[in-house]
Amino acid sequence: MNAADISRAPPGYLEVAWIADTCKLLMGLGWTTNYAGMIYKSLKDRTYGMALMPLCCNFAWELTYAVIYPFGSRQDKFTHYFGLMLNCGVMYTAVKNAEREWTHAPLVRRNLPFIFIICIAAWTTAHLALALQIGPSHAQAFSAYGCQLLLSVGALCQLLSRGSSRGASYFLWFCRFFGSLVLIPQDVLRYRYWRQDHEYMGSPLYIWFVSIFLLLDGSYALCLWYVRRFESEQEEAKKAKSI
């Protein structure tokens, strides 16, 4: 997700830059579709699709790099602006429906508006602090990796704790998984042909991130299948009792 200055790119990278640009375009398409799908699914199921902490972190990231540190190509800026707009819709459905998911925790339920505000403010300051520490260009990439892992963990934990597929679907999973997965070929191209500015993409930490991302999101698909099978068995058992 690093917004590298293409004017510094070596000739070898320029020959394959169109592939990297296509990957970024597909990333935007995948995540845009995911956001729109989450809004629809949340309104339909009267719940929220993204766990609260990752949602606030992701919203703060979009806010930081669409409004506070807008930079990059026109395509990058449009992607951030549009992503922020859709994230506002995702946030709206979460605020609207969160109370229904927290009946088991009255203290949390009564203070959900404050929790949203505090979490968004805290994550925004975290993104800003990282941008001031290492520069917006690298901070955008590193914090995006962090957002992705938090989202993957949050989605898996939310699915298992609910024991229900409400707010979730294979389509939503595939859109976000594909939207993040397609950036890996882009990073490989940058590391291979533009290593001077992308040395960290061959680091143990980056390899660990990719491995954990694949493990978590792959596990999510399996868990969603298991939860849906359990729901189907429960429904069949209810029908059998009513006969």
Curated annotation (Swiss-Prot):
It is found in: Membrane. It holds the Pfam family Pyr4-TMTC. Keywords: Lyase, Membrane, Transmembrane, Transmembrane helix. It is a multi-pass membrane protein. The chain crosses the membrane at residues 11-31, 51-71, 112-132, 141-161, 169-189, 207-227. Its EC number is 4.2.3.-. InterPro entries: PaxB-like (IPR039020). GO terms for biological process: terpenoid biosynthetic process. The keyword Membrane applies. Pathway: Secondary metabolite biosynthesis; terpenoid biosynthesis. Diterpenoid pyrones display various biological activities and subglutinol A shows insecticidal and anti-HIV activities. GO terms for cellular component: membrane. One of its GO terms (molecular function) is lyase activity. Terpene cyclase; part of the gene cluster that mediates the biosynthesis of the diterpenoid pyrones subglutinols A and B. The first step of the pathway is the synthesis of the alpha-pyrone moiety by the polyketide synthase dpmaA via condensation of one acetyl-CoA starter unit with 3 malonyl-CoA units and 2 methylations. The alpha-pyrone is then combined with geranylgeranyl pyrophosphate (GGPP) formed by the GGPP synthase dpmaD through the action of the prenyltransferase dpmaC to yield a linear alpha-pyrone diterpenoid. Belongs to the paxB family. This is Terpene cyclase dpmaB.
